[in-house]
């Protein structure tokens, strides 16, 4: 049995599983709930009864509206989807004796791990791309706007960036699954990394910077007859630089930087974050491959 044959069997098992269907359904519902904000009346339209969000914002790019609506949901939920799909990729097979059964046949270890990787990555792309494609299609219908070529290009770029972000978390989850050989430990490790990156480190970074720089410094600025107290610009510059360096240790930060570039400009100007996510994914998958091939399965 070759790696491709293993991948086909694995992919079929994954997409037919209740876990996969439940994850895709929940992800889709969360994205759709985020898109509901696109059609809500904005503050600018409250005083104009006949105006709608579409009429007021008709000059804005469709892709920007959609990305703003689902951006937070994508940032929070995509790592969860990736972790849930990857935490038992290897450990589950070890626990169920599938790996031992396969190795009893004329199958090489590298065929097993490569086939599993291919099936997992394909199912991940399907699990992320399908809800996003459905959400984007509904957004076009809700807004009643025909997307331009620039809109389509930017949305496709965004889908690609989301896929790379998902791949990074999936690779990390597979690594935990391979190293621990235990699905519970693997899931716990993946969730802890996600919680630390998304919620804990941003708060901790502020406390760490306060310890390094001391309390905020303020300066008085004369504005006409009023005196305005503002935070010292040099202090804020150092604060922002240190925070960026600390948060750059997380995958979420690099995705958020790329997402902000797509929201603010016509495209990605700095590819550093994208390179980091791709390099991390490749390095982690290679590490998982090495550990699995060299480890004895009892």
Say what each PLM segment does:
Residues 39, 289-298:
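Membrane-interface capping segments at transmembrane-helix boundaries
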Residues 38-64, 192-195, 199-286:
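Terminal transmembrane helical anchor/hairpin motif
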Residues 26-40, 54-75, 114-181, 224-225, ...:
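Secretory targeting signals
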Residues 17, 160-201, 206:
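A structural motif at transmembrane helix-loop-helix junctions in multipass membrane proteins
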Residues 82-86, 134, 171-172, 188, ...:
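Hydrophobic/aromatic residues in alpha-helical transmembrane segments
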Residues 1-27, 293:
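Aromatic- and glycine-rich beta-strand/loop motifs that create alpha-glucan
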Residues 88-122:
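Helix-loop-helix units of permease transmembrane domains in multi-pass membrane transporters
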Residues 75-79, 91-92, 161-165, 280-281:
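Alpha-helical transmembrane segments of multi-pass membrane transport proteins
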């Amino acid at each position: 049995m070759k790696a491709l044959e293993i991948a086909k069997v694995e992919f079929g098992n994954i997409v037919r599983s209740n876990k996969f269907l439940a994850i895709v359904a929940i992800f889709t519902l969360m994205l759709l709930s985020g898109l509901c904000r696109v059609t809500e009346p904005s503050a600018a339209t409250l005083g104009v009864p006949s105006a709608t969000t579409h009429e007021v914002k008709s000059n804005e790019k469709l892709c920007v509206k959609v990305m703003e609506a689902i951006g937070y949901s994508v940032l929070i939920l995509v790592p969860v989807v990736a972790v849930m799909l990857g935490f038992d990729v290897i450990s589950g097979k070890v626990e169920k004796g599938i790996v031992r059964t396969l190795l009893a046949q004329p199958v090489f270890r590298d065929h097993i791990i490569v086939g599993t990787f291919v099936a997992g990555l394909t199912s991940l792309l399907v699990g992320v791309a399908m809800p996003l494609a459905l959400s984007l299609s509904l957004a076009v219908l809700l807004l009643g706007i025909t997307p331009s070529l620039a809109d389509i290009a930017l949305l496709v770029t965004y889908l690609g960036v989301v896929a790379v972000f998902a791949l990074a978390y999936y690779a990390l989850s597979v690594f935990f699954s391979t190293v621990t050989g235990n699905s519970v430990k693997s899931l716990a490790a993946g969730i802890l990394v996600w919680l630390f990156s998304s919620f804990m480190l941003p708060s901790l970074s502020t406390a760490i910077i306060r310890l390094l720089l001391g309390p905020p410094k303020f300066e008085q600025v004369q504005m006409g007859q009023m005196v305005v107290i503002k935070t010292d610009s040099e202090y804020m510059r150092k604060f922002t630089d240190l925070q960026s360096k600390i948060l750059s240790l997380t995958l979420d930060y690099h995705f958020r930087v790329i997402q902000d570039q797509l929201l603010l400009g016509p495209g990605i100007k700095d590819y550093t974050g994208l390179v980091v996510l791709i390099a991390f994914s490749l390095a982690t998958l290679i590490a998982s491959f090495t550990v699995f091939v060299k480890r004895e399965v009892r």
